[in-house]
Design a protein with these regions (language model features):
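Membrane-interface alpha helices of multi-pass inner-membrane proteins
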Residues: 347-362, 374, 399-401
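Membrane-interface anchor segments at the N-terminal boundary of transmembrane helices
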Residues: 57-73, 242-246, 511-605
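Start-transfer (signal-anchor) and selected internal transmembrane alpha helices
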Residues: 1-29, 64-104, 128-186
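Short acidic/glycine- and proline-prone juxtamembrane loop motifs at membrane-interface regions
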Residues: 291-301, 361
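Transmembrane-helix motifs of polytopic, lipid-linked glycan transferases
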Residues: 249-270
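Extracytoplasmic catalytic/substrate-binding loops of multi-pass membrane glycan-assembly enzymes
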Residues: 193-206, 214-230, 237-242
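Transmembrane signal-anchor helices characteristic of membrane glycosylation enzymes that use polyprenol
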Residues: 18-38, 101-113, 171-198, 399-411
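Membrane-proximal stem/loop segments at transmembrane-domain junctions that anchor or position
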Residues: 415-550
Length: 606
C-alpha cells in the first residue's frame, strides 16, 4: 500500500489532467448520438463567434439530460485509466494501439451506417466531425484498456479450485459429464420450440427434395438431402413433426458433442478452470448456442464441422513434427494429461468428419479447406524429415475430405438430377456495389453501360431493390446468358469503382458494419415451424408437409424467443451473444499469439 501511495504521488499533474481528458472523451463517446439539431437563430455576424455559438449549442444538445451519467462514467474511466495506464500499468503489446484504433474506427463507421446508411453522417453537419473524433479516440482508449487487461487476465496464474461434490463424476467422465449438462440445458429450448424453427431456405430445401421445385445447387445439396430425408421419414411414419424434431435432435447431439470435446481438449491444454467454466456457461446459456439448436439451417452443421476441424488443426500444430503419424518416442507439446491421450487415428477421423461437414454444408467450405490444407502441407514438408511414408499418408489424409465430399455431392446430383445454379451467390458482393452505384450515381451512367448492366441485372429496378443489409433482392434478378455478358459487366463494374471507390466501400461496409459493433447485432430468431411456409403456399406444399405446433405449446416459441432478445440487451450476457464480440476477440487473440511467439511458431496464427 505504501509503495502504491508513493507511485500515486509521483504521477504528475500533467498526466492526471491528460488521463482525465481521455476519460471524459471516452465518456462522451459512450453517450453522444450522431443526430445533431440546428441551434436557434442568434443573428451573429462574426464568423468566429457564430462558430463558437453553434459548437456550444450543439455540444449542449448532444449531452442534454445525461449529466449524472457523464459524471459517474468520467470518474469511473478516470480511475480505471489512471490505475491501469499509470499507477499499475498493464503489459504493452506491440500493435495493441493500432488494433484498438482499428476497432474504434470500424465502430465509428458502423455508427454512421446505423444512423443513415452512409459514412457522410460522420462529417455532415460539420459538428459531426468532432463527434467522430470523439468516437475514435474515446472507444480507442476503452478498447486499448480491454486488450491489455484481457492479456493480463489470460496470463495470470490464479485459478479457482471448486470443491463441489459433483466434480468427482466430472473427473471420471469429463466428456460425458459436460455433454449431458449441455444437452440438459438445451432441452428446454428444444421442447419450447417443438417441432423446430423453419426458415425460407428450409422450405426451399424441402421443395427441392420432395419434387415441388427444381432441385438446384442454390442450397447445399447434401444438407438439402439430409434434411429432406429426416422429414420424409417423419411423413412415412405419419408425422412430419417427428421428422423435423429428429433432425433438430440430431444436429443438437452433434453440436453438443463437439462443444464437450472442446472443453476436453482445453483440459488437456491446462486451460484455467475459470475459463473452462465460463466457456461451459456460454455454451449452455448464450442463445447463439442454445437458441440455434432448434433451427435446422445449414450454418449449424457447418459450424459443427468447422469447430471440430479447427480443434484438430490446433492439435496437429502442437505436435513436434506436425504429423499424425508419430514415432512412439515422439511427444506432443503440452499434451501430457490423461484427456490428451487421444489416439492419432481418432484425430485423423475427427479431421475428416469435421472437414467433410464443413465442405458439404456451405459452398465456401471447400475454399476454406483447400487454402488451409495447402498451409498444412507446407508444414508437413518442413517438419517431416525422415519417412516418405509419413509424407504420403499425410497427403492422403488431406485429400480424403475433398474426395469424400465430391463423391457424396456427385451421387446426390446424379440420383436427383440436381441442376447447377447460376453463379449469383458468388457475385453477390459486386452486384450489391453496382446496385448502390445505380441508386446514388445513376445519372452518371451512360446508356451503353446501362444496357450492359441490364443484361446481367434488373437495372431499372435496382434502386428500389437495393437493401443495405442484404444482397438477396439484387442477386435474385441475375439473368446473364453467357460469359461474355459477365465479362462486359465486370468491365463496367471496374470503371464505376474507379469513378466512385467510396461508393463500393460503403456498399460492403454498410452490409457488414455490425460485425465490429458490440452494442448492435442483426441476429434474427425465427420463432416456429410456420416461418417461411408462405413461399410455397400457393401450391399447397405447406399443407402437404403439415408442420404444426401442439396446442399445449402455443405461445411457447414466442416466449423463449423473447427470452433470447432480453438476454441480448443485458450488459454482459448480451455481449457474449454478439457476433462482434467474437470477431474482435479473434483479432485480439491473434495479436496475443503474435506477441507471445514473436519470431517463432507463427503457424499458430492460422
Amino acid at each position: 500500500m505504501f509503495e502504491k501511495a508513493i507511485t500515486r504521488n509521483t504521477i504528475s499533474l500533467r498526466k492526471r489532467v491528460s488521463v482525465f481528458l481521455l476519460a471524459f472523451i471516452s465518456t462522451l463517446a459512450f453517450n453522444i448520438e450522431l443526430y445533431t439539431s440546428d441551434p436557434e437563430e442568434a443573428y451573429i455576424h462574426n464568423r468566429f463567434f457564430l462558430f463558437l455559438y453553434k459548437l456550444n449549442s450543439q455540444l449542449a444538445s448532444s449531452v442534454s439530460g445525461k449529466g449524472s451519467i457523464i459524471v459517474a462514467m468520467t470518474i469511473l474511466f478516470f480511475f480505471a485509466f489512471l490505475y491501469f495506464f499509470e499507477i499499475h500499468p498493464l503489459i504493452k503489446i506491440k500493435g495493441d494501439t493500432a488494433l484498438s484504433l482499428f476497432f474504434s474506427i470500424m465502430y465509428a463507421g458502423g455508427r454512421g451506417f446505423a444512423y443513415n446508411d452512409s459514412l457522410s453522417s460522420l462529417m455532415i453537419p460539420r459538428f459531426n466531425i468532432l463527434k467522430t473524433i470523439i468516437l475514435v479516440i474515446g472507444y480507442g482508449a476503452f478498447y486499448l484498456l480491454l486488450i491489455r487487461l484481457l492479456y493480463t487476465i489470460m496470463h495470470t496464474s490464479k485459478d479457482i479450485s471448486p470443491k463441489w461434490p459433483i466434480l468427482h463424476i466430472y473427473n471420471k467422465h469429463p466428456f460425458f459429464f459436460v455433454y449431458i449438462i449441455i444437452l440438459i440445458m438445451w432441452s428446454i429450448h428444444l421442447i419450447m420450440r417443438y417441432p423446430g424453427a423453419m426458415s425460407y431456405d428450409n422450405w426451399r430445401q424441402l421443395a427441392y427434395y420432395m419434387g415441388y421445385d427444381t432441385y438446384t445447387t442454390a442450397q447445399p445439396i447434401f444438407h438439402t438431402w439430409l434434411f429432406g430425408t429426416f422429414i420424409r421419414f417423419g411423413l412415412f411414419i405419419g408425422s412430419s413433426n417427428i421428422g423435423l424434431f429428429l433432425f433438430i435432435l440430431f444436429q443438437s447431439l452433434l453440436m453438443a458433442a463437439v462443444l464437450a470435446y472442446t472443453l476436453l481438449i482445453m483440459t488437456s491444454w491446462h486451460t484455467p478452470r475459470w475459463l473452462r467454466l465460463l466457456t461451459l456457461c456460454i455454451y449452455c446459456i448464450a442463445p447463439y448456442f442454445a437458441g440455434y439448436a432448434a433451427f435446422p439451417i445449414k450454418d449449424y452443421l457447418f459450424v459443427v464441422g468447422l469447430l471440430l476441424w479447427t480443434i484438430e488443426i490446433i492439435s496437429l500444430l502442437q505436435k513436434e513434427n506436425k504429423s499424425w503419424f508419430l514415432n512412439k518416442s515422439e511427444t506432443v507439446l503440452k499434451d501430457t494429461s490423461s484427456t490428451g491421450n487421444i489416439p492419432d487415428l481418432l484425430h485423423v477421423f475427427f479431421w475428416i468428419i469435421g472437414a467433410a461437414f464443413m465442405i458439404l454444408c456451405r459452398k465456401n467450405g471447400i475454399y476454406i479447406y483447400i487454402l488451409t490444407s495447402l498451409f498444412i502441407l507446407i508444414l508437413f514438408l518442413r517438419h517431416i524429415r525422415k519417412s516418405p511414408r509419413e509424407v504420403l499418408m499425410s497427403i492422403i489424409v488431406l485429400a480424403i475430405p475433398v474426395v469424400l465430399t465430391s463423391s457424396i455431392d456427385t451421387a446426390i446430383t446424379n440420383h436427383y438430377n440436381v441442376i447447377q445454379d447460376s453463379p449469383k451467390e458468388m457475385f453477390s458482393l459486386p452486384f450489391q456495389q453496382t446496385a448502390r452505384f445505380v441508386r446514388d450515381y445513376g445519372d452518371e451512367i451512360s446508356d451503353d453501360d446501362k444496357e450492359i448492366i441490364s443484361k446481367v441485372l434488373d437495372y431499372d429496378n435496382l434502386p428500389e431493390l437495393y437493401s443495405e443489409m442484404t444482397a438477396d433482392p439484387v442477386k435474385t434478378t441475375y439473368h446473364a446468358q453467357n460469359n461474355r455478358e459477365l465479362y462486359d459487366y465486370f468491365s463496367v463494374w471496374l470503371k464505376e469503382f474507379l469513378q466512385h471507390p467510396l461508393c463500393y466501400i460503403e456498399a460492403t461496409w454498410n452490409q457488414n458494419y455490425y460485425i465490429f459493433m458490440p452494442d448492435m447485432d442483426n441476429v434474427v430468431y425465427n420463432q416456429d415451424c410456420y416461418f417461411g411456409s408462405a413461399t410455397y403456399q400457393d401450391i399447397g406444399f405447406d399443407k402437404y408437409i403439415g408442420f404444426y405446433i401442439p396446442s399445449a405449446l402455443e405461445g411457447a416459441s414466442q416466449t423463449i424467443c423473447s427470452w433470447y432478445k432480453m438476454l441480448n440487451e443485458l450488459p454482459i450476457i448480451g455481449r457474449l451473444n454478439n457476433v462482434a464480440f467474437y470477431i474482435m476477440l479473434m483479432f485480439t487473440v491473434l495479436l496475443y499469439l503474435k506477441h507471445d511467439f514473436q519470431k517463432k511458431n507463427h503457424e499458430y496464427l492460422i
